[in-house]
Amino acid sequence: MKRDYGGVGTIALRASALLKAMSQDIEDQRKEFNQTEYYQTFTRNAVAKLPKLSRRIVEQAIKEMEDDGYQFNKKQVGNVEQYALTIQNVIDIYAHRKIPKYRDIYKSPYVIFVVNLKGGVSKTVSTVTLAHALRVHQDLLRHDLRILVIDLDPQASSTMFLDHTHSIGSILETAAQAMLNDLDAETLRKEVIRPTIVPGVDVIPASIDDGFVASQWKELVEEHLPGQNQYEILRRNIIDRVADDYDFIFIDTGPHLDPFLLNGLAASDLLLTPTPPAQVDFHSTLKYLTRLPEMLEQLEEEGVEPRLSASIGFMSKMTGKRDHETSHSLAREVYASNILDSSLPRLDGFERCGESFDTVISANPQSYPGSAEALKKARTEAERFTKAVFDRIEFVRGEAA
């Protein structure tokens, strides 16, 4: 800039410094209290209660695996060393028992787009919560679900929740840049895809600069990817190339109709529409639903054949208020059988997790800034919601088979 324009430049510098400081503070605290890894572990008795397992099965599997040289995670309790089985330990026990994994049943990943043109409807929170919860839900551990979140929202909110060190400033290895640069699978794995604190859940980050890419998308595709359809880039250049690595792939875009959202629609198998009950949000969601056929028609006119097999709505930010229940009833009229029985309620836990750049699944109760009971309640609701989504996906895929 030629000048400060009444403090614009100065404020930007301060904001950048504060963002970096906030991120560094969180990182320093995690390192200080040894919380840089996912916290949840299981006792042998807890694992024995999981589906398709029993105490005798678990004890026998552990013995056989240790005899073969496998090392289980343990912790010191006083003078005694006890098993503290990690998510991976449990998955390996299932594998030792030859329980089929999800990838043994379905060879290709299922692409899920949580989408709404209204901002502030819990779209990102729903996405990242589902991503983490699908991986660690106790009823789903036997499936060894591998999850990828592709963040195409320049606000990078999903990136903040899943990998906060890459959610500030400008970064080159974003989903938008990867789409344009036509990277091979190995380069995507090594340079673009980032792990999250929950092993088995990865993210491709977004950056504020991606907004400029979206605004010039058609011209950039013509320049860098001649001959490719501008609305099939996400599917062809990212999803298809890492398809063997994941069971579920989530897409997160901003709440505006742009080429990223249309790429998301073109690439998706399932649309999930968060539907808040507040009057203004509910009204805006209905307007989005009326526009959705036009967007799909636009893709068809551009030579794209959408892959959608289902469009499911669910209530977000629900409370027990009477007007919220009224909105829920109206939503049932609109979605009919295409609405989830489970909703994502408005709870303190979902909101406060952002203070430590966590989801309600990844947040460690020992360092969570709010009430441990509130976090537990939010996690319980998140797990119930996640199981409902998984069960609906199984129903949809079963019908299509």
Name what the model sees in each region.
Residues S207, K317-N364:
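Beta-strand-loop-alpha "switch" segments that mediate conformational coupling across diverse proteins
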